[in-house]
Amino acid sequence: MTDQDRRRALIIESSDEIPRKSFLKRFPVPRNFGVAPGSRVRRGRQWPAPSGAKQPKTFQIYRFDPDSGDTPRLDTFEVDLDDCGPMVLDALIWIKNKVDPTLTFRRSCREGVCGSCAMNMDGTNWLACTRAIDDLGSPATIYPLANMPIVKDLVPDLDHMIAQYQMIEPWLHEKTPAPESERLQSPQERARLDGYYECILCFCCTSGCPSHWWNGDRFLGPAALLQAWRWLADSRDEAKEERLDTLE
């Protein structure tokens, strides 16, 4: 069984079988992220602008395939903005469709709802589908989220982040018998959840958190902590003391 298989197997194990306080001790943060020690990002291939392009923009994009045995590189692409949508994700799709089909990245909703296309653009973690190309410099630099192993190119391995999210048990805990109708909240109780339940688990915040960089085996990170508070603040939840004990 590979290390990745072990990580995935750990994620799907029932939390009842793993004491929550020891959960992270069984899930250490990988330190080399699949990159050889001392490796530097090297200059990669340069792809010219299409013939006749009147509004080209330069994108420098991180490329890395851990299975290839090669070191990371930055490929340079000239994107014709007249033939491309306004968002960074549009540019990535344009490159994949028209220049280099091997470029790998996540995307799904294209509406800022799913969190799949989170990446680092010009030094800032953002969703590629909501970041305008015009907001980036030239060249625009595109990297995967930091502090995570790389599956390929702009695709980070989220296993550790998901395991930390699972640890806080992000569902309603009930001790009293279920009512015949739904569990009601007052408007004021419901309003306490505003700003928390909207989290789409893109992990931009956790990727950019220095405390998580150095202590990810013990510190849950901002995304998981926000979700923990979301359930602590929920008037319907009946396991607040247990949740607080888990977070100690």
In which residue ranges do the predicted regions lie?
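Short, Gly/Pro- and small/polar-rich lid/capping loops
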Residues: 3-48
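Short, contiguous pre-domain boundary segments
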Residues: 38-41, 70-75
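Ferredoxin-type iron-sulfur electron-transfer modules in oxidoreductases and energy-metabolism complexes
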Residues: 85-101, 140-248
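Short, contiguous acidic and Ser/Thr-rich linear segments
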Residues: 73-86
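Short polar catalytic/cofactor-binding loops
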Residues: 61-67
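Local cysteine-cluster metal-coordination motifs and their immediate loop/turn environment
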Residues: 59, 70, 103-135, 194-214
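Beta-strand-dominated extracellular/periplasmic modules and repeats
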Residues: 58, 74-76, 97-100
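Short structural boundary motif marking the start of a folded domain
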Residues: 53-59
